Amino acid sequence: MFDKIKQFLSDIFCSFYSEARTIVRDEGVALFMLIVPLFYPILYSWIYNNEVVREVPVAVVDASHSAQSREFVRRYDASPDVKVAYFCNSIEEARRLVAKQEVNGIVYLPEDLSKRLNRMESATVSVYCDMSLMLAYKAILTAATSVSSLMNANLQVALAPGYTDHENSITTQPLNYEEVAMFNSTGGYGNFILPGVLMLIIQQTLLLGTGLLYGSRRERGFFITTSTLPILKRRLPMLRIITGRTLCMLLIYAAVTAYVLLAIPKMFHFVQLLHPADLVLFVLPYLLACIFFAMTIGMLIPQREDVMLVVVFTSVGLLFLSGVSWPQSNIPSFWRAFACLFPSTFGIQGFVKLNTMGALISDIVYECRMLWIQALVYFLLALWLLHRACKKKYY
């Protein structure tokens, strides 16, 4: 009995060593598994480190040339979010500036603005935004809304019968409110999107590295290395091989995950409310699900380079399907079911709750359960695919 256990552990170590040696010797695999996870999170975090956009350039078309229009432009330019970069004589001139990407939006003040206000009629200020940059669009529209609300309040005070500041404040703002940011205290885009992106980077780099690894083996005609061939003569050979390979990748990505999920947020001062013990309990099923998922996809892809196309065309879609950048309640049921095939869906949801909302492991039982189910299903699939490949004598 002891000899069998010793032989089992020896075979696992042999598979572990063979996999580690293959990863280090293959430049493409080493690049995506060891180098890319070090620098890619830094690049993304650095891009979004400013959190919010400031001084977005805007073109103003003032057809009114009145005191009210000048007041609107002055208050609008005073906003920290936007900057009046150009004054244009027509909408067409402003549109050419947008086409050249010199400005991100247009504010049009109509000719009858002052006349309508003096007649106590409703006037319209038109705002045109470049929708290709959502943060710039938000800054332009929010600043215009704030200025128009403030000027509306001033007009109400001027027309109201009140005589004191207290009466005027009740007239313009009868219901006061206080906005409290519960989790994303900065209100920035980095704290909002980066936790999901970091979890997706772990899955996609694992998929890239494993896909290249198994793609090379398929091109060479075997999935079993020469050093592990003797294992095939023993009982449950595929289990021994898969276990060794899994432990190798788990060891590598344990270090990668600690760097990506713990070091990167601290380096760029992102919100981090997680508890280390809960993170370990959550990351274990996520890594196992990602490893077995990558093995399964890697053995299904016919050529080595095909995995790069898969990752490129799925990364943005998987981020949307995770429910972080778009509410899950607004995603069609078919796509919600499709998203359940990927570990990143539950990994991102669980990590956002742990990291940004300060949840405990007991609060993400559903995500953990789904990740364990995925790990089991993809483990069995990878085991069956490897057994089928060996049965067809690819080695």
How should each PLM-predicted stretch be described?
Residues M1-N191, D363, Y395:
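Extracytoplasmic/periplasmic domains immediately adjacent to an N-terminal transmembrane anchor
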Residues F32-M33, P195, T243-G244, V307-V310:
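Hydrophobic core positions of alpha-helical segments in small-molecule transporters
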